[in-house]
Amino acid sequence: MSFDQLNVIETGGGIAGPLVGRALRDLGANVVKLESRRRLDFGRTRVPPPGKTSEHVHASPSVHDLHAGKASVTVNLKTELGRTIFVDMTSKADVYVDTYAPGWLERIGLSYESFQERNPQLIILSQSAYGTMGPKRDQRAYAPIMTALAGLESTVGYQDGRTVSQVSSAVGDLV
């Protein structure tokens, strides 16, 4: 199958999920970005352009870059209608990308097995901070936490020992 025949559903937030969706879109895939109207992708208010404030939803240049070429649909997965729409869309998709914490989909009545029953060919890419297995799987984390744990925070600062607040980019989302 060529990329232009690939249908992707993306619910990933921040940078990691949208970056995967953007890469697949750049290769020709049809990507649909799903997000809640009540809890927008937090990347939408990240670093607004000059003269704008974080209240200018969608103003972030990175959001324009990461969401370029994607269709966008708002769905509330906490409602029956929202879950029905989501299940219908993933039943017809080739790839599903999310950045939910492990167990979140199960808590709203969806599971890996339910995806596979409806669509055995569906490729699921679930990106959480600590993975879906292991002792820290239920812990949430964002770039500053992960860069500190990886030791990257020790690489920024000044020769006299003063530090800066954090590594300046979400490097963990980009690798």
Residue ranges and their predicted role:
Residues 1-175:
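N-terminal helix-loop segment corresponding to the beta1-alpha1 unit
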